[in-house]
Amino acid sequence: MERPNSRLHCHPETHTYKCTVQPYFPLHTHATTVYGNVTKHRPSLGTLQAGDTLHARRFLSDKRRSYRNRSLGPTIASAPSVEQEDYRTPRPSFDSNGYVGKSFDFSSAQHGLTASESNALVKVSADFLRLNGSRQQFKNLLSARKKLGSLPPAYTRIDYSRESLDSHSARGIPNHHGPVITVEDTGSQLRINNIKPSVNQHLLESSCSFEKTMVTQCESNGSVTSHNTSSAFQRNNSRYGVPIDSTAVKQVYRVRSERLTNRVRITDRSLYLALFGVILMLVESEITAEKFYGVSKTHWISQSLRVGVTCSTIALLYHIILYHLNDIVLELVDCGADDWRVVVTTERVIQFCIEFICCGICPLPGSGEMKWTFIEPSLHKDGPSEERTVQTRNVDVPVDVILSCFMLCRSYLFARFMVLHSKQFQDASTRTLAALNRIQVNFSFVIKTSLDQQPVLFLTTFTFIFWIIMSWMFVQCERYGFSGKNPQSILYSNSLWFIAITFMLNGYGDIVPQTNAGRFIAIFVGVVGAVISSILIAVISRNILLSQGQRNVNNFMYDSKLAREHKEAAARVLQHTWHIHKCLQGSDGGNRRLRTYQRKFLKAIHKFRSVKSEMREFSENNSQNNPQMTRLVTDMHTSMQRLLNVQDEMRMQIEVLQQSVRNHYMHSTPNVPHLQGLTSSPVPSDRYDNRF
């Protein structure tokens, strides 16, 4: 039995071989490799002669090159990526000599194809790559600078060259058997440690035993000069990928599951804190604006409420930071990087800053007042229209008014809550199918699904909530300009009326905004109303359309009607033609009756042409059914072809049966005595065939 990558030195005087054994991890432990119907025997060292030195060197060189590209263990890099066609199970690799192996399999060539089917690591690793994409192939490229020098190769390609092994042995570099992904802390990120897995340890022990066998075989043919490289084995430092084991895959899935659960919990707490702060803000704004029980902005009740709003805002900002940190760790788990700065992109930083600012706006204690310009239109003045002029005046308005309006921007957390609690995101099968089809389960996907499944409920709920929020914001902006002219009930009623009319893109001019903020709210409401109106029209148009089955029924009935009218028009043309012929042949009726039949004949021709035109237009308008008809014809043709094949096979079997019966009858007829009452001559074969 001969191992690859061994060095043979032939001495011409003694005709002996000098073998230099180099350590390796044997993936094939059998001396005979079976591939297909061809059995290849590896040449033994004892059978080599002096004339076969060149052939032996070529053989060992080819085996060294093939084993150099052979994978040692299951690696993320050697797994098939999502972009490949067959990504369910790893494909077998064939080297130049016909040996079969798999990058995920530790078995020999004879058992490689069957062992991988029952290997749970193969299935789990393939599914993991299908969900996380091809970024895992470049895992070592995402490592930190300080760790790149200590990381062994990921693709686990073995370098059996003399220069590589001698250099490593001379320098005394410690042995590395490949890093294995382990998870020390499931609450944080993954850490890569250079530990010896049980599989690699088993391979190392088998390689040592195999090396002893090779040394014994080499000693039988000559002296042995062996390098002490079994304990200082180094793989080619390609820094590409990281080998993984089944425990690492389970830990990765566990970390990912925990991070997804933490994201949902953080979002829930963030929404609760945001709603709590908004409720406190609403209570404080209403009691201070209406001066209930003499409570003003400087009262201790108002200050206490704003302190509660500030505390809830601080807690909300803390949860926003936790949410983005959790997303960064989740991205680290997905891509395999060990430095958090790799996944922190510009888009993520901008998103975090926008969310932090939106959630950080709130009414603060002792915020003070500011000057706000109110524009009093001429409609609110008495007297002749010529004397009415637009006047502006500055009014002291609390800063909490504008802060309270911007505080409602944190309502975007409800959209995130809706996405994370949707059945599309909660269902693992739906999320897996979406990942395999490169579809992200985000806010856009959930909104489109809701509009497709329950459009009326979604639009009604959104319109009602939007109407209430915009009405309250309009009241906050306009309530300080009336200075007690109208009671608060009339103010809220006018606000609801104004927002509803503006939302429906109507304007009667009875209520107009007095502040620039109110005008901005009116413009925003008009734009949103236009968008919602267009969506509502599209939904109604889709609902009033006929289904495909209903259209098929109507098309069939209309087609039958056109066919009947076509036959009737053709019959009328023939009928009036016969009448004209009878009038021309006979003398009864005169020219008056002839002209009557001729006019009817022309009318029948025009009717026939119009029916033909309608049939042509109907066939053109229903051209979309042609693919269905083509598919139906193809299916019918396939079924008929299958039936014909069955008939041909049955006919052949009947012919074989007939021939067998004929042969049996021909051989058994001379030995059968003639029955009484029958002819004494044997039945001819052609008569038997006809009778049969």
From Swiss-Prot:
InterPro entries attached to this UniProt entry: CaM-bd_dom (IPR004178), CaM-bd_dom_sf (IPR036122), K_chnl_Ca-activ_SK (IPR015449), K_chnl_dom (IPR013099)
Keyword field contains Transcription: no
Single GO term (MF): small conductance calcium-activated potassium channel activity
Chain segments annotated as transmembrane: 270-290, 313-333, 349-369, 401-421, 455-475, 520-540
Extent of Polar residues compositional bias: 667-683
Pfam families linked: CaMBD, Ion_trans_2, SK_channel
Localization annotation: Membrane
Record keywords, A-Z: Ion channel, Ion transport, Membrane, Transmembrane, Transmembrane helix, Transport
GO biological process terms on file: potassium ion transmembrane transport
Ranges within the bilayer without spanning: 492-512
Segments for region (Disordered): 667-692
Annotated signal peptide: none
Gene3D superfamilies on file: 1.10.287.70
Membrane topology: Multi-pass membrane protein
GO cellular component terms given for this protein: neuron projection; neuronal cell body; plasma membrane
Protein purpose: Forms a voltage-independent potassium channel activated by intracellular calcium.
Subunit and partners: Heterooligomer.
Annotated family: Belongs to the potassium channel KCNN family. SK subfamily.
Protein name: Small conductance calcium-activated potassium channel-like protein 3
Lineage of the organism: Eukaryota, Metazoa, Ecdysozoa, Nematoda, Chromadorea
